[in-house]
Amino acid sequence: MAAKSRKKLVTLILLILLAGCANQLPPGGGEVDKIPPEVVDVYPPDETINFDDDYIEIEFSEYVDKRSFQEALFISPFIEGGLDFSWTSSTVTIEFKEKLKKDITYTVNVGSDVVDLNNKNRMANSYSFTFSTGNKIDRRMITGRVYAEKPEGVLIYAYRLGTETDTLLKAKPDYVSQTGNTGDYELKGLSESNYRIFAVLDKYRDLIYDLDQDLIGIPCKDISLIADDTLFTNMNFKLFKADTTAPRFLKGIMTDKKHILVTLTEEIDKRLLKPSNYLLFDSTTNEKSQVQYVYQKYGKPAELIFVPKDKLNIDNSVYLIADVLKDTLENKYQNDFIHLTISDRPDTSAINVIATEPKQNSSIDFVDPKIIIYFDDGFEKNDIQKHITFTDTLGNEVPFKINFDDDATLVVSPLKDLKADKDYIIKFNLNRFIDSEGNKGDSLYQFKFSTISGLDFTGVSGNIGNFDNELNPVLVLESYNRKGLQYQKKITNENFEFDRIEAGKYFLWYYSDTDSNFQYDFGWPQPLKYSERFSVYGDTLKLKPRWTVTDVQFNLK
């Protein structure tokens, strides 16, 4: 009996142990694992020479997602024939289907897209090692950084320069690396050659730049790694979308008999928000009619609202025609048109204010302010200014002018600077704002705001190292967390100063304004146009109210 009991006990213990081995799950409760995986060992060791095996091995600090690893593995130069992968625990063996080339330095790059198995933590940085099938390691290297909102995971393409330089991006690169979470990258083990480097946010990870899908960073120059030139640093990139597609109409539907809602493929140039660029064509009667108002739908820049001047017949076939549709990159499409779904639903809604910039009861700068008021419909603009008052809270009038971004957007600008630390009111009666159907409001609208104190501003000053006026340098102070807030100025000597700056976190950078248009040029991929050279100050500047940061030393690279 005792022997049988012991056998049952041993069997039970073995079953428990086997179950534990077969189902290795993290214990319940406790802190969530946030530790990124790391490469802890490789075969062959970094910088091995005379390598003649047909496989390499990479060991991680924990189990990783196999698919993420395979998509993040790049071996340069490209290995013909493909690879086979086999896993043992947290170690992967990569076998080469064809023999490696003789006297070649290979670089293995494990990109930062690798994630662990349980919590999908990404590698903090890419990892690379080199080995050679010959008796020496090519030690040439290129380093830099990609500056983007999300800089991790960007691929760095390196091409040896030959005769077909304008078709490089149609082929896979000779060498590949990937940025870590800071945007830094290294291209190691490069052979002696001239190189052209691109940064590509490769959506499909196929190592071919897709103009319609991928963001790209263009180099400011090509790189020569010949003879004693073995290292090039600070090949930095800014990413952008090389858009070559003109905007088009997608859909047009009348929400009532006086409003046509049109969806486009992208936002158009605001200079085309004018009725004269459009017309309505009734193909049933072969008659044309005019657009009375056109404006952008608030918060949806790719949607426009058109107000027809004449009534459209619900039984007829009607088209909206644009003389030209153009985006901000000057991509244009002539004579686009779209068939409309007609409605005879009455328009009885009174016009209203739907938003303002700045917001109601907020504070703005007293120097050259602009107040933008968004309405939900187009309106008659003749003599509208005489129905608007602009005063301080004591009733003192402020001289002002008005203009219109489109037929439903009013911009109010004082003719001189306002006073600091003071309250102001813009008033108008909505019964003076009349839409195309004669609908009007019946209430008094008041927009209240205040100006900031001049004491709340901050500033920064310092010195430029390696200053060269022939580079036509422009210095930019750009907000770290407020999109669109930046200050820039052309610098003509080694000293610089920014004053009247809103407090906050900023990064400081410069670009060489070679075309003198006071705007950074990202370049162009095909045919190649180099980007403008730029450099970024290493530290984030924390600018506090009423305090100027001085003695910033910015060395241009």
Where are these regions (language model features)?
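Acidic, low-complexity Ser/Thr/Gly/Pro-rich repeat segments typical of extracellular/periplasmic
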Residues: 21-189, 194-200, 212-218, 235, ...
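Phosphate/pyrophosphate-binding loops and the adjoining catalytic core of nucleotide-dependent enzymes
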Residues: 466
